[in-house]
Amino acid sequence: MTTRRIIGQDGEEKTYLDVDPRGPPGPSNISPAVPASVIWKLMSFTFAMITLPIGTYFFTVNYVFGGNATYAGALAAIMANVVLIAYVIMAFKDDQAEQAEDAREAKKEL
């Protein structure tokens, strides 16, 4: 198979981008797709999900329950659920705030 070669007036071979009638593209949008606050919350809750249940387990098994791993494990599982529920609640509130902001902008346009 052959490809079409574009030869300019000066005799040099051109690419499709060189002869594009639309011209060079404008500046691109390089803003992140996800806001930094969302990433910060996710990283914070990830850290809490890792450290809080493990820390709770070892603290309670050694100092509170006197070696009873069953109670310490149950409390660690409860703490993991607390972190998860807190993250879900915060995500819902953040989403509701964005929806309220979009509604305010829609009212301004009317």
Curated annotation (Swiss-Prot):
Similarity section: Belongs to the VMA21 family.
Keywords on record: Cytoplasmic vesicle, Endoplasmic reticulum, Membrane, Transmembrane, Transmembrane helix
Lineage: Eukaryota, Fungi, Dikarya, Ascomycota, Pezizomycotina
Taxonomic source organism: Phaeosphaeria nodorum (strain SN15 / ATCC MYA-4574 / FGSC 10173) (Glume blotch fungus)
Residues in the Lumenal compartment per record: 66-71
Name assigned to this protein: Vacuolar ATPase assembly integral membrane protein VMA21
Stretches with biased composition (Basic and acidic residues): 11-21
Pfam name, any one: VMA21
GO biological process, one term: vacuolar proton-transporting V-type ATPase complex assembly
Stretches the record annotates as Disordered: 1-28
Motif (Prevents secretion from ER): 107-110
Chief location bin: endoplasmic reticulum
Signal sequence residues: none
